Amino acid sequence: MADRVKVTLIKSTIGAVPKNKKTIEALGLTKLGKTVELPNNAATQGAVRKVAPYVKVEEV
């Protein structure tokens, strides 16, 4: 398992459930196509799982 993961916003949050919008914002994703590098821990994995249709995840 990688130490860090790259998460990229690939789908717009227009029309998304407000809870999902807040989760995406908490991950640091503000604009379409933005990529952030996050630690690969349980909290990050859970947040990414909740917004899986909106993001792409790659191990670093």
Curated annotation (Swiss-Prot):
GO terms for biological process: translation. One of its GO terms (cellular component) is large ribosomal subunit. This is Large ribosomal subunit protein uL30. Belongs to the universal ribosomal protein uL30 family. Keywords: Ribonucleoprotein, Ribosomal protein. Part of the 50S ribosomal subunit. The keyword Ribonucleoprotein applies. The keyword Ribonucleoprotein applies. One of its GO terms (molecular function) is structural constituent of ribosome. SUPFAM superfamilies: Ribosomal protein L30p/L7e. InterPro entries: Ribo_uL30_ferredoxin-like_sf, Ribosomal_uL30_bac-type, Ribosomal_uL30_ferredoxin-like.
